[in-house]
């Protein structure tokens, strides 16, 4: 493989959301993913940096912290479901950019700041949907969230009567698939340095995608769960070695082994200039960017918002 270097048992889960009114879903559309944020923990541009990526006027180089929206048709004609993976610090800005006013649930990969510090803003969805929101995560992650956001999960301890998010925690287990609104979700074990975290595989009918951010390793038992994918989203932080993230070359090696139909690199730092790297990638590998929509049918499009 050519190296890329810098040029310098199924669980059925009841949805707790109170508002069951759903937007119309375009006929013929399929399982798809919207990149709300494609950057690393510092975001791009970084504070106080004048490198060529942080100064780039290409909107694809302007990356907010990592989060995606998964959406797919519902069982009833003309309806859809959509789930948020992670709540980035810019979540409010991200969802407003893309006119997202309803979610069927939230899934958390791990409790690092760039993946959870938008959790408080879920309270606005409670108001719009007039009901609670399902929150799916591993038990250890739920405990960490309850520690960090005690005012949300134990509102009775707040000195003032505050308006906080109304969340319904659901512990999930690695490898135990669950049905969320007409799709099969399988939590995947990934390694983020020494920290075990989650990725997710989503199957609906014959379509499938997997989201594997913040990974530096894939355990042997996870590989079979990543076979026969239409779309793979995988971490590719930078060109140089990093102890807790795949490099570009390491991500390409994983893609070559897993052989998805298409793959997209995400969680990218300011080492990567979009136009430069994408021109040198294999034909079925692409760079993500904020606002990109990836459809399992093979279509991609720019989502209205950041790129307008």
Outline where the language-model segments fall.
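Cap/insert and terminal regions of metallo-dependent hydrolase folds
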Residues: 216-298
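Short linear motifs in low-complexity or flexible loops
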Residues: 2-6, 16-17
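Short, low-complexity segments with poor structural confidence in diverse proteins
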Residues: 19-25
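Alpha-helical transmembrane segments and their juxtamembrane interfaces
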Residues: 17-18, 120, 224, 245
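A signal for specific C-terminal beta-sheet/loop modules enriched in small/flexible residues
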Residues: 1, 102-109, 202, 227-237, ...
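Binuclear metal-dependent hydrolase catalytic cores
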Residues: 9, 25-212, 221, 278-307
């Amino acid at each position: 493989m050519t190296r890329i270097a810098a040029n310098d048992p199924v669980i059925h889960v009841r949805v707790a959301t109170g508002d069951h009114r759903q937007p119309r879903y375009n006929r013929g559309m399929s399982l798809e993913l919207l990149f709300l944020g494609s950057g690393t923990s510092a975001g791009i541009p970084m504070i106080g940096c004048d490198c060529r990526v942080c100064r780039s006027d290409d909107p694809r180089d302007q990356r907010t912290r990592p989060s995606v929206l998964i959406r797919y048709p519902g069982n009833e004609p003309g309806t859809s479901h959509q789930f948020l993976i992670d709540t980035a610090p810019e979540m409010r800005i991200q969802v407003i950019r893309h006119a997202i006013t309803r979610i069927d649930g939230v899934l958390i990969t791990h409790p690092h700041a760039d993946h959870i510090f938008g959790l408080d803003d879920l309270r606005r969805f409670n108001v719009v949907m007039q009901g609670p929101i399902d929150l799916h995560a591993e038990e250890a992650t739920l405990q960490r969230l309850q520690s960090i956001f005690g005012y949300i999960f134990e509102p009775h301890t707040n000195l003032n009567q505050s308006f906080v998010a109304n969340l319904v925690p659901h512990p999930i287990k690695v490898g135990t698939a669950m049905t969320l609104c007409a799709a099969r979700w399988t939590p995947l074990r990934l390694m983020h340095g020494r920290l075990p975290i989650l990725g997710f595989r989503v199957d609906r009918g014959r379509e499938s995608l997997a989201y594997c951010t913040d990974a530096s390793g894939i355990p042997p038992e996870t590989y079979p769960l990543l076979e026969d994918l239409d779309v793979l989203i995988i971490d590719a932080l930078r060109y140089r070695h990093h102890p807790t993230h795949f490099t570009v070359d390491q991500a390409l090696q994983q893609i070559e082994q897993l052989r998805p139909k298409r793959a997209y690199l995400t969680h990218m730092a300011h080492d990567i200039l979009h136009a430069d790297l994408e021109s040198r990638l294999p034909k079925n590998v692409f760079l993500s960017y904020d606002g990109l929509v990836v459809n399992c049918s093979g279509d991609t499009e720019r989502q209205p918002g950041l790129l307008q």
